[in-house]
């Protein structure tokens, strides 16, 4: 199913979606199962401001631990499931990209989405660094993690974790590369009270404004959102 996503690349104006100063159709996870104070974004570490330098091949298996405002959860990645996706995720985690990143789109029973950086300058760089698609080898079962897309070969830094068995996404090119193996109860508690994005009948954040304004917009207008505090690689190929 097509969805509309906004990410304005030049002169950001007025899910996951792209707005190149126009709205574009995106193949997004949208097949839902039936039935603070304003602040400046923290300055970005050079380690994640240059995507071209973050291309290290991921271990065949590794675990990443996420510390969030709801608690901790661990994702186990199997590179063979989605090599390009696993490599991108590995580099995002090890660079510190996920510090203070919001779960900005949370649809109970469906999925929670994250990955737009709190600094618009950083987001802009990653939008211009897509990775090639991977064949879908796994299913979007409960607890799996998958990159959002804006069409063929457009995966960048936005991801989602499936709350349910969303097998309908498998035929749409969403290629899971890992799964939550510890702390799925934490993931289930991520705040979803705002519902989906406005264009889908919810009251959640507008992705175009996140891209333009970053975390200050989210923390001012959506104070109940949960955030990733940090993410770290905790094991690779089974060794600490």
Question: Residue spans of the language-model regions?
Answer:
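Cyclophilin-like peptidyl-prolyl cis-trans isomerases
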Residues: 2-240
């Amino acid at each position: 199913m097509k969805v509309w996503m906004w990410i304005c690349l030049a002169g950001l104006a007025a899910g996951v979606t792209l707005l190149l100063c126009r709205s574009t159709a995106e193949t997004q996870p949208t097949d839902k199962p039936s039935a603070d104070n304003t602040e400046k974004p923290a300055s970005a570490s050079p380690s994640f401001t240059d995507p071209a330098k973050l291309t290290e091949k991921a271990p065949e298996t590794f675990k990443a631990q996420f510390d969030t405002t709801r608690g901790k959860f661990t994702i186990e990645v199997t590179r063979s499931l989605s090599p390009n996706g696993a490599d991108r995720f590995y580099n995002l985690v090890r660079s510190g990209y996920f510090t203070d990143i919001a779960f900005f789109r949370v649809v109970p029973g469906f999925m929670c989405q994250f990955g737009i950086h709190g600094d618009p300058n950083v987001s802009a760089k990653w939008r211009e660094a897509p990775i090639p698609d991977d064949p879908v080898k796994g299913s979007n079962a409960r607890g799996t993690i998958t990159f959002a897309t804006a069409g063929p070969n457009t995966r960048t830094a936005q991801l989602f974790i499936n709350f349910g068995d969303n097998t309908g996404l498998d035929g749409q090119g969403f290629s899971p590369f890992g799964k939550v193996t510890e702390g799925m109860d934490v993931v289930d508690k991520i705040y979803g009270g705002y519902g989906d994005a406005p264009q889908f009948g919810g009251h959640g954040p507008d992705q175009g404004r996140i891209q333009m304004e970053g975390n200050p917009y989210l923390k001012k207008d959506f104070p109940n959102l949960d955030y990733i505090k940090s993410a770290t690689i905790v094991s690779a190929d089974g060794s600490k």
